[in-house]
């Protein structure tokens, strides 16, 4: 059924509910915002290019704290560096509740390390952090895994020299294999059919979640969930991924050695066995399944998407790529493999990677939250369970911190002496208690993959760099890089 028809039906049904129930009552004192229409809320003020653009425009008119109505549902928007930091750092506990993403709700059901709330989340987070310590962040092993994967990518690119190709698939392979190594304890060949199927499902799902149709579903999910649409396609895709995860979990269970856990799944299974008599434990099969699903989806797509944007920017600004290569040649040379220790000696390359993350802005709104208790924030009383979005894009493009916020310029992260400078507006992984748990791995991947590729290859575009369009393929909860062609030429 056409989206416009479903939307009309949704409005009509909402009108009937409005007549029966009247206005929803909200105690507290929500911040003002654009005047909503009955039933429609602020829908007509939303840009089809994505809600993010609309929220930035509303920020200019209503300030950093305002309320937008998704249909009849009030949602508080927080914009600007200082506002977001105040909420997520100074009021961290109050803003730590995870909100619901309607298109994912049927499959996630508030389970998993990123979708549970309060105490349940803290328990699973501790396990995840411990597992990343043992199998990922802070260990030489994860750096070795990334370097080995980068080596495989360099070898694969030899098969494509001089040929224009879409790099999306290859970037998915390398980031997907790092997550697979940590979660499943194995990596896959780039031609493995099962691996390719999983990557295709994840990419299509990521694009669907970021689509305008998905944003419309967030507004009218109570009605649209009964009809065919983007939510059912997402469910179908993720159900197939879950079937694979379930099969892997059973294989892990059959070969589990309590004295030698191999990966995240093994570690979780050991906790399940330890707490099998606890009826209230968070270590149960479905939490394991959803945690692995989310790690696989977020860990693969967000980093590969950033790499796609990064190399598109190198095509558009070839002088930047040349300057990065000059620093690589000076610090690393052509023979030695890049290491994470090189970061401290390569301020320009680090500034370029930071600017890629800032400019590409792949997670413009982060994940929604719900207030855990009645909270006085900037003069407004936000009731418990108030839905809140943090417009991270407004910080990454904050003119108070970035002289040219809408221009790609690595100088944003360099001081007068050419050293890398910190910036509190830089929050691509969010901040506070709910910041991305995989930040350390993602930062390591971006540096090692980026430098290894440019150490071995120069890049060129089959089109004039001045004509390269940076408009995202989709822009919603996430921004999906546009499809493009790139040519890798051995140095």
Swiss-Prot record:
The membrane topology of this protein is: Peripheral membrane protein
* Any Pfam family the entry gives: p450
Which keywords does the record carry? Answer: Endoplasmic reticulum, Heme, Iron, Membrane, Metal-binding, Microsome, Monooxygenase, Oxidoreductase
Tissues with expression: Liver. Not found in the lung, kidney and prostate.
InterPro entries to which the protein is assigned, alphabetical? Cyt_P450 (IPR001128), Cyt_P450_CS (IPR017972), Cyt_P450_E_grp-I (IPR002401), Cyt_P450_E_grp-I_CYP2B-like (IPR008068), Cyt_P450_sf (IPR036396), Cytochrome_P450_fam2 (IPR050182)
Mostly located where?
endoplasmic reticulum
> Which residue pairs form cystines in this protein?
none
Q: What induces it?
A: Constitutively expressed.
Known EC number(s)? 1.14.14.1
Q: Which CDD domains match?
A: CYP2B
Gene Ontology process terms (BP): epoxygenase P450 pathway; ketone metabolic process; response to Aroclor 1254; response to bacterium; steroid metabolic process; xenobiotic catabolic process; xenobiotic metabolic process
List the Gene Ontology MF annotations in alphabetical order: anandamide 11,12 epoxidase activity; anandamide 14,15 epoxidase activity; anandamide 8,9 epoxidase activity; arachidonate epoxygenase activity; estrogen 2-hydroxylase activity; heme binding; iron ion binding; monooxygenase activity
Q: Does the keyword Iron apply?
A: yes
Write out the residues that bind heme.
436
What GO cellular component entries does it have? cytoplasm; endoplasmic reticulum membrane; intracellular membrane-bounded organelle
**Catalytic activity entry:** an organic molecule + reduced [NADPH--hemoprotein reductase] + O2 = an alcohol + oxidized [NADPH--hemoprotein reductase] + H2O + H(+)
Where is this gene product found?
Endoplasmic reticulum membrane; Microsome membrane
- What cofactor does its activity depend on? heme
Q: Which family does it belong to?
A: Belongs to the cytochrome P450 family.
Q: What does this protein do?
A: Cytochromes P450 are a group of heme-thiolate monooxygenases. In liver microsomes, this enzyme is involved in an NADPH-dependent electron transport pathway. It oxidizes a variety of structurally unrelated compounds, including steroids, fatty acids, and xenobiotics.
Q: PANTHER family from the entry?
A: CYTOCHROME P450 2B6 (PTHR24300:SF406), CYTOCHROME P450 508A4-RELATED (PTHR24300)
Protein name, entry field: Cytochrome P450 2B3
